[in-house]
């Protein structure tokens, strides 16, 4: 009987002005080890009793739905889920489960995983291609969904830039983070963001790292979401003072992303100190860019 292991990277989306558009895969991974089984048995590492209930486990729900979409009956699975991507921090933890389950279901059914099949299943659980695609394909992508069609493209990302991700102890759900956003954006703010996301992509392409600070400014979401994150401005400023090239929320938060080409430890420590001033514990991770995406192995 085959045992399959899929390793799926965390993602960080938006990167400042690229709201619901840009996504980047990081070298932090959740792993899912699956084998056929009569009924569902789930083991989690670290132990998470909530996720060991099949109805609460997103990976199981997705693989069950994927089977149904192919006209198959889901009889069960034995799953070991190794969680390293923190939940509700803006690092795409749900996307890892969705992508992992789709990749495994495609392998089990010996079906080619086309874009149409992938998005048909994935959008049942998450509507954000800027998270889903880098978790699946890896690298740096820009994406949009137009009616029933998804368009995306990969963008070169400099190899000398790392992501310093500062992760506070508190969770921030995507639903709550979206609830504080305005329904309408002034024209001047739309122009502001279009200018900056264009500058951001050009600065990366031409290695003009001196432009990244202004290019990662935003008026679409961060001015509203930062109110949910104590001492946000101080954490960001500490990152810049320590040598960060650009700093922004990671996805919807609560994690904060700093792009840097040096001083990685200093940046991480300075930003965690910013949270400490508000009485909030946090940790930082220094991550490279994952360029492979979801990786499937047959263990036996």
Curated annotation (Swiss-Prot):
Name the record gives this protein: Homoserine kinase
Catalytic activity: L-homoserine + ATP = O-phospho-L-homoserine + ADP + H(+)
Positions of ATP binding: 86-96
Subcellular localization(s) per the UniProt record: Cytoplasm
Presence of keyword Transmembrane: no
InterPro entries: GHMP_kinase_C_dom, GHMP_kinase_C_sf, GHMP_kinase_N_dom, GHMP_knse_ATP-bd_CS, Homoserine_kinase, Ribosomal_Su5_D2-typ_SF, Ribsml_uS5_D2-typ_fold_subgr
Gene (name only): thrB
Record GO terms (molecular function): ATP binding; homoserine kinase activity
One GO term (biological process): threonine biosynthetic process
Cellular component GO terms, alphabetical: cytoplasm
Pathway per the UniProt entry: Amino-acid biosynthesis; L-threonine biosynthesis; L-threonine from L-aspartate: step 4/5
Keyword Transferase tagged: yes
EC number: 2.7.1.39
Key words of the record: Amino-acid biosynthesis, ATP-binding, Cytoplasm, Kinase, Nucleotide-binding, Threonine biosynthesis, Transferase
């Amino acid at each position: 009987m085959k045992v399959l292991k899929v390793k799926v990277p965390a993602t960080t989306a938006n990167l400042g002005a690229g709201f619901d558009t840009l996504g980047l895969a990081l070298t932090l991974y959740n792993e899912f080890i699956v084998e056929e089984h009569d009924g569902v048995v789930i083991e989690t590492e670290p132990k998470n009793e909530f996720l060991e209930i099949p109805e609460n486990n997103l990976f199981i729900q997705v693989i069950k739905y994927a089977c149904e979409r192919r006209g198959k009956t889901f009889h069960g699975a034995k799953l070991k889920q190794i969680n390293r991507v923190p939940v509700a921090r803006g690092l795409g933890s749900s996307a890892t489960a969705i992508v992992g389950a789709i990749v495994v279901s495609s392998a089990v059914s010996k079906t080619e995983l086309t874009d149409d099949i992938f998005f048909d299943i994935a959008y049942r659980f998450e509507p954000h291609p800027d998270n889903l695609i880098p978790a699946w394909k890896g690298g740096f992508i820009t994406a949009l969904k137009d009616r029933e069609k998804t368009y995306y493209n990969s963008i070169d990302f400099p190899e000398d830039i790392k992501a310093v991700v500062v992760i506070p102890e508190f969770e921030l759900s995507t639903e709550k983070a979206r609830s504080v956003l305005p329904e309408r954006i002034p024209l001047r703010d739309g122009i502001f963001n279009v200018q900056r996301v264009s500058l951001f992509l050009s600065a990366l392409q031409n290695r003009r790292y001196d432009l990244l600070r202004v290019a990662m400014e935003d008026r679409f979401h961060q001015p509203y979401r930062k109110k949910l994150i104590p001492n946000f401005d101080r954490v960001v400023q500490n990152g810049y003072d320590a040598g960060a090239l650009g700093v922004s929320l990671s996805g919807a938060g609560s994690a904060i992303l700093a792009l840097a080409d040096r001083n990685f430890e200093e940046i991480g420590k300075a930003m965690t100190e910013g949270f400490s001033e508000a009485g909030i514990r946090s940790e930082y991770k220094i991550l490279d860019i994952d360029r492979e995406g979801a990786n499937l192995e047959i263990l036996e």
